[in-house]
């Protein structure tokens, strides 16, 4: 899985 910021 790629490290992505938790945006909505």
Curated annotation (Swiss-Prot):
Superkingdom is Eukaryota
Q: What job does the chain carry out?
A: Inhibitor of the proliferation of hepatic stellate cells (HSC). Also inhibits the growth of bovine endothelial cells and 3T6 fibroblasts.
UniProt name for this protein: Non-arginase growth inhibitory factor
The species this protein was found in: Rattus norvegicus
């Amino acid at each position: 899985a790629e490290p992505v910021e938790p945006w909505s």
